[in-house]
């Protein structure tokens, strides 16, 4: 498992209060992990801070699964 994936998983567990086993690449933030719109905003902010990147709103709307987040962050950091 990549270091970035581990860091992303840890952020998701911390922000959403879910078990690490639930955080799979296929997991949807809303449907599988129970995130609401505020959770998603806070999660994007956590990703931006942790990886020192900027995620524009139009890109954030496309990040729907853990795998989406990993791919986006790996491309930009």
From Swiss-Prot:
<feature type="modified residue" description="O-(pantetheine 4'-phosphoryl)serine">
    <location>
        <position position="37"/>
    </location>
</feature>
<dbReference type="GO" id="GO:0031177">
    <property type="term" value="F:phosphopantetheine binding"/>
</dbReference>
<dbReference type="InterPro" id="IPR036736">
    <property type="entry name" value="ACP-like_sf"/>
</dbReference>
<dbReference type="GO" id="GO:0000036">
    <property type="term" value="F:acyl carrier activity"/>
</dbReference>
<dbReference type="InterPro" id="IPR020806">
    <property type="entry name" value="PKS_PP-bd"/>
</dbReference>
<comment type="similarity">
    <text>Belongs to the acyl carrier protein (ACP) family.</text>
</comment>
<keyword id="KW-0596">Phosphopantetheine</keyword>
<dbReference type="GO" id="GO:0009245">
    <property type="term" value="P:lipid A biosynthetic process"/>
</dbReference>
<dbReference type="InterPro" id="IPR006162">
    <property type="entry name" value="Ppantetheine_attach_site"/>
</dbReference>
<comment type="pathway">
    <text>Lipid metabolism; fatty acid biosynthesis.</text>
</comment>
<dbReference type="Pfam" id="PF00550">
    <property type="entry name" value="PP-binding"/>
</dbReference>
<feature type="domain" description="Carrier">
    <location>
        <begin position="2"/>
        <end position="77"/>
    </location>
</feature>
<keyword id="KW-0444">Lipid biosynthesis</keyword>
<comment type="function">
    <text>Carrier of the growing fatty acid chain in fatty acid biosynthesis.</text>
</comment>
<keyword id="KW-0275">Fatty acid biosynthesis</keyword>
<keyword id="KW-0963">Cytoplasm</keyword>
<keyword id="KW-0276">Fatty acid metabolism</keyword>
<keyword id="KW-0443">Lipid metabolism</keyword>
<protein>
    <recommendedName>
        <fullName>Acyl carrier protein</fullName>
    </recommendedName>
</protein>
<keyword id="KW-0597">Phosphoprotein</keyword>
<dbReference type="InterPro" id="IPR003231">
    <property type="entry name" value="ACP"/>
</dbReference>
<dbReference type="InterPro" id="IPR009081">
    <property type="entry name" value="PP-bd_ACP"/>
</dbReference>
<dbReference type="GO" id="GO:0000035">
    <property type="term" value="F:acyl binding"/>
</dbReference>
<dbReference type="GO" id="GO:0016020">
    <property type="term" value="C:membrane"/>
</dbReference>
<dbReference type="GO" id="GO:0005829">
    <property type="term" value="C:cytosol"/>
</dbReference>
């Amino acid at each position: 498992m990549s270091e970035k994936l581990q860091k992303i998983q840890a952020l998701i567990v911390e922000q959403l209060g879910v078990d690490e086993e639930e955080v799979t690449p296929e997991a949807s933030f809303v449907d599988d992990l129970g995130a609401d719109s505020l959770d998603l905003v806070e999660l994007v902010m956590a990703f931006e801070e942790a990886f020192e990147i900027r995620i524009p709103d139009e890109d954030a709307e496309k990040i729907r699964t853990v795998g989406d987040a990993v791919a986006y962050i790996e491309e930009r950091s």
